Amino acid sequence: MKYISTRNNKTDFSAEQVLNYGLAPDGGLFIPKEIPKFSIDQINALKGKNYFDIANFILSPFLLDLFDSKTINKIIHEAYSKFDQEIVSVSNIGDNELLNLFHGPTLAFKDYAMCLLAKIYEYYLKKVDKKLLLIGATSGDTGSAAIQAFKGIDNISIFILHPHNSTSLFQRKQMTTSGANNVFNIALNGSFDDCQNLVKKLFKDKNLNETFSFTAVNSINWFRVLPQSIYYAWSYLNCNIDNFVVPSGNFGNIYSAYLLKSMGFPINKLIVATNENNILHRIISNNDLHLYNVVKTNSPSMDITISSNFERLLAEFLGPDSTKELFQNISNNEHNKKLDSSIHNLLSENFLSENATSEEVENQIKNTYENYNILLDPHTAVGVVCAEKLNLKKVMCLACAHPVKFQETVQKVLGNNINYNKNIEFLNEEKFEILDNNFEALGDYIKLNA
């Protein structure tokens, strides 16, 4: 399978290059030159299959350039070996359902891709006898999932940037108490967008890239986005629901659903649910591309203003030249504040959107607990609020994280006497470095510790 950049379709890249680079050399994101298509008969034949078999079916066209079938099967089984016996589960909330994606090691949906990505790199690096330096920016869950998945793996050092004092305490401790010698935590005095911009600068810096082999652990990495399509496939095959409500910040999770749709799965509507940082909702509903400063909310993993994976979708609609111009201008806030009407119409054909305030989120946590005895984390609550505001029925709302990760918000709404059915202890001391939003300081820290 060949890959191209979202900003240049003239140069082909191999799966191995995509795995090594993370970000395309021109600053774009990697996408397949041609997305594999499955027939409806092939898809229907998956009904009754387990999660491992569905994963193998979806991943094999992308991984066979790197591994043989036996190794792919081993990677999948080892990746999910630390999950609960029930890898995914479903709960009813009246007219709609919850797809519970908190059965992994760090109790968030990021585990489903990150554990697989770690195994892909582990097997690949053994094969080629190479060392890699993984870089990631996180608003909370990506960092903890990456650290849990990659800690202790030979030939890998992992550096994670998070916005200082902008994650939940639980999220921060999941990142900072690993005790692993190959893990380096950076608390940046800035926003998630600042963290993400520094990561992208690292990939473009010629001097650092001559010294280190960088690759991305964020969803800018194609092999991070791809595995998330598996749980949408499992949900469709097991629940017969083809509409999904996805709490959205960086657009990676819902792009994975769109990818599955592009592969032939009969997905109907994809509903983008945002908090007050609602650029995705504004683009889809009103064609409004204005950028605003990040607002802190009670769903911090979605406190994002520039949604990186949106570039993958727009590359399909706009083509590489217009995509390159748009995102280069966005980085300088010099872009047009509206998309061409034909492009906006394509968005509207595939996506609905809505947004939720922090107050609405708190009310939803309270109402869902009182009516169904189900605890929602605030990000999941964003999705449920949006489904109700759109008056949607028979949709699958993604439950992105276990509520124990966001006890501050849950306890504010429901009090302290809540049974989370999870007993989590952080036994190691926290270890992280606080840095200013400065590229040179970050580069010096990496040189000192890598």
Each language-model region and where it sits:
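PLP-dependent amino-acid enzyme catalytic core
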Residues: 1-450
